[in-house]
From Swiss-Prot:
Keyword rRNA processing included in the entry's annotation: no
Family that this chain belongs to: Belongs to the universal ribosomal protein uS2 family.
Superkingdom per UniProt: Bacteria
Alphabetical list of Gene3D superfamilies matching this protein: Glucose-6-phosphate isomerase like protein, domain 1, Helix hairpin bin
Coiled coil: none
Record key words, sorted: Ribonucleoprotein, Ribosomal protein
A single GO BP: translation
CDD domains registered for this protein in UniProt: RPS2
Gene name in the database record: rpsB
Residue ranges of the TM segments: none
GO CC field: cytosolic small ribosomal subunit
Keyword Ribosomal protein tagged: yes
Official protein name in the record: Small ribosomal subunit protein uS2
Length: 244
């Protein structure tokens, strides 16, 4: 199981929170103290919280559950897309559209339209259109790809959300709460932990820190999937041995 150590977290500055004047009092249990008017996060809480969440995600991947990676702010967007794609999980990294979970039927229609446009682009339909019409469809495709591209293969609601910066993604969390979908969240000292089932107190702004968390969750997914594949291989071998 891929685990993250306190040293790993210290190296990327996970312990640095926000300026003390911007703190959320609900994060008090996770704060070690303050240095130069910056809150310091108690990594004694972060390490077990993060590793327990990684174990949960690994087990979910073993059971072929879907983990939706969510991080739309600049510090997280690129990493969310890369690591979710690497682990074969859905993601939202541009902008959370209201109703992405609670109005999934409408979202499904948009995904269908995205697929239609992708087919038209690849089969030469765009080439037969007027320049203006082709340009309009290309723009529509780009817009849909930006907002829906990461969830087009999700095939239904996710089983868990992994969120970087819970305040920034509050709409996503509220939708998940409404549907009873558990939420794993990286929660900084200025954030409200309400609605987050698995709170990971940590810096959510430093790019290297975000890369560490998101990469670890992608690794956990891959390890869970590999464990499932390994079990399937063993089953085949046992069956063959029995038949022999």
């Amino acid at each position: 199981m891929p685990t993250v150590s306190m040293r790993d977290l210290l190296l990327v500055g996970s312990h640095f929170g926000h300026q003390t004047r911007y703190w959320n009092p609900k994060m008090k249990p996770f704060i070690f103290g303050a240095r130069n008017k910056i809150h310091i996060i108690n990594l004694e809480h972060t390490v077990p919280a993060l590793n327990n969440a990684l174990e949960l995600v690994k087990k979910m991947a073993e059971n072929k559950n879907k983990v939706l990676f969510v991080g739309t702010k600049r510090a997280a967007s690129k990493t969310i897309k890369e690591q979710a794609a690497r682990s074969g999980m859905p993601y939202v990294n541009h902008r959370w559209l209201g109703g992405m979970l609670t109005n999934y039927k409408t979202i499904r229609a948009s995904i269908k339209r995205l697929r239609e446009l992708e087919t038209q682009m690849s089969d030469g339909t765009f080439d037969k259109l007027t320049k203006k019409e082709a340009l309009m469809r290309t723009r529509e495709l780009e817009k849909l790809e930006l907002s829906m591209g990461g969830i087009k293969d999700m095939g239904g609601l996710p089983d868990v959300l992994f969120v970087v910066d819970v305040d920034h993604e509050r709409i996503a969390i509220k939708e998940a709460n409404k549907l009873g979908i558990p939420v794993i969240g990286i929660v900084d000292t200025n954030s409200n932990p309400d609605g987050v089932d698995y709170i990971i107190p940590a810096n959510d702004d430093a790019i290297r820190a975000v890369q560490l968390y998101v990469g670890a969750f992608a690794d956990a997914v891959l390890e869970g999937r590999n464990a499932t594949a390994g079990t399937a291989d063993e089953f085949v071998e046992v069956s063959e041995a029995t038949e022999a």
